[in-house]
Amino acid sequence: MKNVILTPNPYRDRNFQTVRSAIQILKDAGIQPKLCLPFEVDRNYELPKDLRFSRLDRELPNTELVICFGGDGTILHMAKAATRRGVPLLGVNIGTMGFMAELESTELEKLSMLATGEFTTEKRMMLDVTVQRNRDILFHDICLNDAVITKGVIARIVHLSVKCDGVQAMECGGDGVIVATPTGSTAYCLSAGGPIVEPEANNIIITPICAHEVGSRCIVASDRRVVTVEMVRNARRNAYVSVDGGRAFRLNLGDVVTVQKSHLETKLVRLKERSFYDVVNAKFKKV
């Protein structure tokens, strides 16, 4: 492996200390990495003059791997761009939880294993999310974790209808509904009372958020199902959909949010021999 991109979150990696160490380790292993920002920074933010940054959109088509430095949010953000190009992703945690990261910032020496091919690639299911208004598709995105349909007004509830393959699965009033992948089952979905699902499982997890109903329950559906969510006809409030914690899209009465398995899969690079349950136990001890 020779062509590698490093994408540090400048607000997490202060003075780029972690990425500087990674650059040296990779160079010593015979890899000449390119440095790119994962997103645009504030105009007033001054990048260090001794580091040369390239444009991500120019480098991504020619790379073999993206190494992302940050928390889970940064990794989720980069997963979309990398997946659309079919490029594997390796996360280095500089955040709090870092559930999706393969390495901690104290384990950078393991990056030298990339030069000798001592790694595996793990595929993760993604979801396609669209919003249809009348006959027009107004919103489309992919997600690795989840699509969240939620209320837009504090101290109010939103009434949502959820269907699987056109058949009513649940109708609930509350703060909203999470539609998650197995990867996303350990994120917001878990906080809302959803189950932990192994990432290799083929499921779509539907979890109500603070439902105002005694019988409200999570649904673990097959990944073959097409899930639709819309506000019920007597709803008096707007709702919003957000994908992997990104910018929210405002929903009107009559809009239909459709969530289904994507043909795209995120490829995560693994350098360590550990099970999913090892990760769960280790990460949640931090909380």
Give the location of each predicted region.
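N-terminal glycine-rich "phosphate-gripper" loop used for MgATP/nucleotide binding
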Residues: 68-72, 80-81
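Catalytic core of DAGKc-family lipid kinases
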Residues: 97-175
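Short glycine-rich anion-binding loops that position phosphate/pyrophosphate groups of nucleotides
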Residues: 11, 72-74, 97, 183-185
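Gly/Ser/Thr-rich active-site loops/lids in small-molecule metabolic enzymes
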Residues: 170-175, 179-215
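ATP/NTP phosphate-donor binding region
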Residues: 1-65, 106-122, 131-141
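Short, acidic/small-residue loops that bind anionic groups at enzyme active sites
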Residues: 85-103
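Short glycine/serine/threonine-rich phosphate/pyrophosphate-binding segments
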Residues: 15-16, 73-78, 186-191
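ATP/nucleoside-binding phosphotransfer catalytic cores, i.e., glycine-rich phosphate-binding loops
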Residues: 143, 149, 154, 165-168, ...
